[in-house]
Amino acid sequence: MSARKMLLICIAAVPHWACSQSTGDQTNDGLRTITDPFEANALIAKSVNLGNALEAPAEGEWGVTLKAEYFELIKSAGFTGVRVPIRWSAHARIDPPFTVDGSFFDRIDWVVEQVRNNDLAAVLNIHHYDELFAQPAEQKTRFLALWRQIAEHYQNADPEIMFEILNEPHDQLTPQLWNQYLAEALSVIRESNPHRTVVVGTAEWGGIGSVDRLEVPPNEPNLIVTVHYYNPFQFTHQGAEWVEGSDAWLGTTWDGTTSEQQAVDDDFSRVVSWANEHGLPVFLGEFGSYRTADPDSRHRWTKYVAQAAGSRNFSWAYWEFCAGFGLYDPDTGEWNTGLIQALFPVN
């Protein structure tokens, strides 16, 4: 069969995002794969979160509706990937078999298509599954059913499309319980995606403090570990409306003193030690500071954290694109040049 005929069959049979002609390893069924998690991690080396859009109860409810031009802007700014927070639990039935709305899958398909059209990589996650955090035992079956559907739906997607099992487990989903749930979710994903890169995070809000309590399944060759970083919290979240008492922190600066830098280094060294012990790459899946902070401090902190991550071969994703922590103002069509220069310094 000619290459042209095979391409036409691919276009007719599956979505555009599943027909990449990029080079790479292939499985027996012809699917391109990336089986080295360090190689996959390099694809998301410099990423941005598409926050406040698809993880809202409904897209647009938190002020962000994704547009095709956003992906073009992200690519042109120098980013290599996006992290896509998604509240799947708001778009699936609450009774068995917990079916995900077809129209919502269509919307995520569109996102994946924009990602690949712009030669970006993406991490798709389950975000803000609040019911699971509050009642893990009652929600476990639904959680696994969501992943079975997501995994099967994207089993033919390009390997640049990665899965992240759950954003920031916390509350009743304890570290011990999370280790159990992530292993079971990973097993479900592997039924249809034996080679796809999967990202796993820490319990207790995804922070570095619980990395030592994270247990990854043995003999799992294609995992990336992710942590989030918002230290010092009173700086990054000063004036955040959803954080009680944060107005009292207004005016907190980050001056880049030796001790401030050392605190970042010490935190990241802890992650490096764990990752080296387990032989896994690291994805700094969220870091950012709220818009009410002093601009110069925001720039200094962002630059130092990004460079500290990069120097340790962490990939990173800034939180986030165009909302309260954002890099881009959709009303003016302008980037926050100070933050962009912090992430992509000239020297």
Feature-to-residue mapping (PLM):
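Aromatic-rich peripheral "rim/lid" segments of glycoside hydrolase catalytic domains that contact
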Residues: 294-347
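Acidic/histidine-rich helix-loop elements
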Residues: 50-66, 90-101, 234-263
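Bacterial N-terminal signal peptides that target proteins for export
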Residues: 1-7
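An active-site-proximal structural segment forming one wall of the substrate-binding cleft
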Residues: 64, 71-80, 97-128, 132-162, ...
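C-terminal motif of bacterial Sec signal peptides marking the signal peptidase cleavage site
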Residues: 17-18
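N-terminal carbohydrate-binding accessory modules
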Residues: 21-83, 98-99, 272-274, 342
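Active-site region of glycoside hydrolase catalytic domains
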Residues: 144-259, 265-290, 311-314
